[in-house]
Amino acid sequence: MSPSDSQGGLLRPAIIEELSRRAAAPARAVDEVRILRDGSEAFPVMMDLIRSAHHSVWFENFIFAGDATGRRFAKVLGEAARRGVEVRVLYDPVGTMMVKGGSIASALRSEGVEGRPFRPVSPLRPWTWSRLRHRDHRKSLIIDGHTAIVGGLCISDNWAGHSEGGHNWRDTALLVRGAVVRDVATAFGNMWRRATMETVPAPNAEAAAPPHAPCGMVAADQPGAHHVASVYIWLASQAQRSLEITDAYLVTPEPVVAAFESAARRGVAVRFLLPGNNNHPFAAASARRRYARLMAAGARIYEWRG
């Protein structure tokens, strides 16, 4: 995109409209955005928000381990539930199995918290590729319907800071306030219904953000929908000067990789920041197989060695 596509640091309405169409999500007002770096910064903020909740805490994560970090969160969630806050926890059991610490289910039960696994697996049922593939990779915390934290942080000692006895894995989260949080809550409600067959009250829908106001949108993929990929492909096609991508796993769909490659070939400065050490060797190997073609197109790839 060129400087003419923005006004005072804000994207033009036509750009917002196209992003909204591709994301299949309205652009809603954003009152505040804060970057939270790593668990050492994010986890205390998350726990303080849970302690401050008056009405509801909705918590969704790919990994909610039963280790020291998970138990600390379970305790804070339990305290909220005991003071009358509606607490709902949705976690992925397959993701949780990938880290040390075991299941968080018993700790949540002992704290009186309603914790539900998404698409649980059982040795009595066949482990089909569909059941293993369709997992809940989202990470969100929604407080009273008006404040949310989203990003890449899972609940495990791996993400906790060294001062908490954790491994301080590098990751990022965003704290968001404003009308856009309603769509984060809607995305949670949809996953909760898929996991439990229960419907949670729909959040109040608010009008779209006014023109030239700070706004955001929630691109919430479902099986068969590829809104996020559509947004990436379009952004890559529109980039004129630079395109910077950071991700834990470069296992994006082929059309997205092709869009990045095409941008580099037409002279856009395309730069990737990827992990040098990866907890999923197969994902790392798959990503590195794409390095040669991307670099041949002119992209630069940097690996984080922290």
Label each residue range with its predicted role.
Residues 1-306:
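Charged, low-complexity intrinsically disordered terminal segments
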